Curated annotation (Swiss-Prot):
Pfam families for the chain: Ribosomal_S15
GO cellular component, one term: cytosolic small ribosomal subunit
GO molecular function: rRNA binding; structural constituent of ribosome
NCBIfam families (UniProt xref): S15_bact
Protein name, per record: Small ribosomal subunit protein uS15
Amino acid sequence: MVMTAEDKAQVIGEHKKHDGDTGSPEVQVALLTSRIVYLTGHFKSHPKDFHSRTGLLKLVGQRRKLLNYLKKTDVQRYRDLIAKLGLRK
């Protein structure tokens, strides 16, 4: 895995709602976003890595599903999260 335990703990700490929060949509989207950013950089130096590209598309789809769920349940939390992560709507 690309992210070390310290990196993961830092991302969780920035987006958690309470102590021990690892499963909220905000935390999950933030973790997926960090993996997506890493893989995007990976493809700049490895353009023919199609197997990893398939994994990237799965991650993007999973993040999209979580964002859609968050948008349906609480629009304000959705807007705050995409602003914080710098994502498009």
